[in-house]
Amino acid sequence: MQPARKTWAGGQTTNVLTRRGRKKSVYIPEHFRSEDQGATLAFMRANPFAILVSTKDSEPFASHIPVVIREQGGRIKLRGHVAKANPHWRYLAEQSPCLLIFHGPHAYISPSNYETRENVPTWNYGAVHAYGEARTFSEIPELLNMLDDLIPTFEAAYAQQWSALNESYRTRMLGHIVGFEIVVSRLEAKFKLSQNRTRQEQQNVIESLSRSSDTTVSGTAELMCEHALGTKAQKKSKDQ
């Protein structure tokens, strides 16, 4: 089940999706590049458990964190928090440029799905890289505001329980976290979903993956269908 989407007023959001010919920091063949920012944001919202990456003394440092994607004032903002014991918040405060990686379903693709024997295995997946500047905060009012975003997104039913907790307990718990907000300056979206294969081969892949009991694998088939791949999508397009 996808987390509930929360929307905010603020007018049209600036398109920060990296387009053809622009500088990029991840290898994306043109077959697999997305130039649809709306679809990219939807993918991020459906897969909000991201990897936050920044540097300390030229060494990479990563944390695995759920985040909320917010569109406000024409900008995309990513909000979340880390444990105060996690030094990552200090690294963000010292050097604000950072990267958040959103990864969705993925699956091994057997060459048995293809129409000729001269083929090799590959892997299908979707991923989005979000680059931006981070700001950290630990003031109670702003932490509460951040949780007002997180709780409705991931478990709206918990809001009442959270509000009913003893205030001293809530304050003590908030003292163990540091919040962050990242204003996104650039998005790079890669959906490697057999776009370089024939429609029939795409359909073979979809049907093969759909038979799996592993939701990560079958989810890859669903992602391919969302991107209008396969013979069924082609037929639907012709019928419209």
Where are these regions (language model features)?
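Binding-site signature for planar aromatic cofactors or substrates
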Residues: 11-240
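Cationic, low-complexity basic patches in intrinsically disordered or flexible, solvent-exposed regions
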Residues: 3
